Amino acid sequence: MNKIRKTFQYGKHEVTFETGEMARQATGAVVVRMGDTVLLVSVVAKKEAEEGRDFFPLTINYQEKTYAAGKIPGGYFKREGRPTEKETLTSRLIDRPLRPLFPKGFTNEVQVIATVLSVDSKVPTDIPAILGASAAIGLSGIPFNGSLGAARVGYRGGEYLLNPSLDELKDSALDLVVAGTRDAVLMVESEAQELPESVMLGAVLHGHQAMQVAIQAIAEFIQEAGGAKWEWEPPTVNTALEKWVVEKSEAPLKKAYQIQEKTARQAQIQAIRDQLLADRAAEREGEENAVNEHELAVIFHELERRIVREQILTGQPRIDGRDSKTVRPITVKVGVLPRSHGSALFTRGETQALVVTTLGTERDAQSIDDLDGDRQEEFIFHYNFPPFCVGEVGFMSGPKRREIGHGRLAKRAVVPVVPTLDKFPYVIRVVSEILESNGSSSMASVCGSSLALMDAGVPTKAPVAGIAMGLIKENDKYAVLSDILGDEDHLGDMDFKVAGTSNGVTALQMDIKIEGITKEIMEQALDQAKEGRLHILSIMNKVLDKPRSQVSDLAPQYVTMKINPEKIRDVIGKGGVVIREITEATNCAIDISDDGTIKIAAHTTEEGEAAKRRIEELTAEVELGKVYEGTVVKITDFGAFVQILPNTQGLVHISQIAQERVENVRDYLEEGQVIRVKVIEIDRQGRVRLSMKQID
């Protein structure tokens, strides 16, 4: 294969695609370079699909190699291990816009691997990873509907920033990633500082417009490489079987989709499906391959999809009887767990989240070591989705990709209102336990986490709520749905999640399965989402509208103090012996910063104050003219040395012991004796002179 190279300007970065030199046995492979960030993106697809498979087995693996940043992995094995949270999230970010571009009915196994070979701190890796995946799939010849582009958009000083660096993002009120084709936006992932809906929509459109140069470059690159397209035809529809399924199942399915309770509805649909299989087997008894269950299931699912969509587009009530704008009934409880620092139970229809906030010390912060550098995460968010929440039996293991993704979305939504460590001295962990799920569990987690944080006394800027929107679109007819059910998400054309305060949006996530989503439709979805969000906030605020005035008595009690940085060594002691003795004696955790700031975390206020007193004694400065009570530690011919502070001794000269003349110091003093002395001089070297006779 000849080496092909394509270079184009993308904002302030030069982007280069290369193929034909690396990974030549892959179905398609591209080396993409953006600044000094370099990735190898490969795609391999199996030529034959597994018979009877009713899903598309697409696997995306994004992996970071530490050598890309000139680092050696930590740990005993000194090699990369299981995927980090960032790798999992980036894999999902690549997957979401790619998946809808594969044709319906294509079930061949496809694996995309994006490997970071070199990293530039000014160029985040996710955008070149998406561009590289699009180019590699295009080169492979796999059935794929169009080139995919992606852009990151920031917002600062009223202007949009295209593909900002990590440093620029620190000052940006927005971090938004948008991906799409020439004509359609397919995916949005964002975090914002309470921005108006108009700014969010403008960012999406700005990014989509900017990515056109990348889409064009990818198309030209693929054309220049000239790879052969796969010969693939979508599976033919058995029209006779389709007609038979419609005749048998349409009427009972329409009735089933009027059952509002999820479990009962699912049971009825399963009964209809089972009866359909039994009827088909009875009619074709004795025939070879009488029942093709896979073919029957595909047709049955399409019938379900058509029934639900027609119902909504013709203005009929939704599955659970609501109109397009109504939010399901909401109940809110806070302080539901007696020994937690903060808790909330948020229920919306058949979706329920128990969210718990725990406050810890700086030592509880999560250490992150990735290509972006070492850092500490002071706000931790975990989302758990056990199988019982959907009435299923399942294997309990570590968090799956979906749980990590939903947890990150909920975290993005509340981070803008959570105080930083310098304003609130606690490390915060929020855990959302999904107890029931029928759509929008991540947004229930947002609402519950806002309540749990306030219940714990965390001084958040404002309450946050989230809502999931959906879309049903056929030709020019469409309906935007508020607070979608799981079935509406599965059978609809868009999943559009918006979270924010009453002032603006803090997180926006969008996944679109079709083309033709116009600016007007997105505007309507955002406006309708705002209406729903404010409604949810009004219900939440009736229960708890602001943070508790103080943290729970069960949380660590913080005492903060400041000392002279030169005294830090006195507090720590040789080999840490002094600070260890204080922590053991007072049962406290003590953190000391280089600037002399000391944070004492105690189980009770009394323990914290005891530790503070010990430190004050260790670091106290000797005051001229002040009287101290000290212990005689050494006697000499010319006087006595007295310890007046834990790390400070002074000399009582023989002439300062008594009013009369003293011939022998030992006639007046002995070692270990406690006496009162006055500081009469501190010389330039810090030496202290004391007097007994000058005390009034």
From Swiss-Prot:
Residue stretches making up the S1 motif domain: 625-693
Superkingdom of origin: Bacteria
Database matches in HAMAP family: PNPase
Family label: Belongs to the polyribonucleotide nucleotidyltransferase family.
Listed NCBIfam families: polynuc_phos, PRK11824.1
Purpose of the protein: Involved in mRNA degradation. Catalyzes the phosphorolysis of single-stranded polyribonucleotides processively in the 3'- to 5'-direction.
Chain sites annotated for binding Mg(2+): D489, D495
GO BP term, example: RNA processing
GO terms under cellular component: cytosol
InterPro entries in alphabetical order: ExoRNase_PH_dom1, ExoRNase_PH_dom2, ExoRNase_PH_dom2_sf, KH_dom, KH_dom_type_1, KH_dom_type_1_sf, NA-bd_OB-fold, PNPase
Classification via CDD domains: KH-I_PNPase, RNase_PH_PNPase_1, RNase_PH_PNPase_2, S1_PNPase
Gene Ontology molecular function: any one: RNA binding
Repressor recorded as keyword: no
Name this protein carries in UniProt: Polyribonucleotide nucleotidyltransferase
Organism: Coxiella burnetii (strain CbuG_Q212)
Names of the cofactor(s): Mg(2+)
SMART domains on file: KH, S1
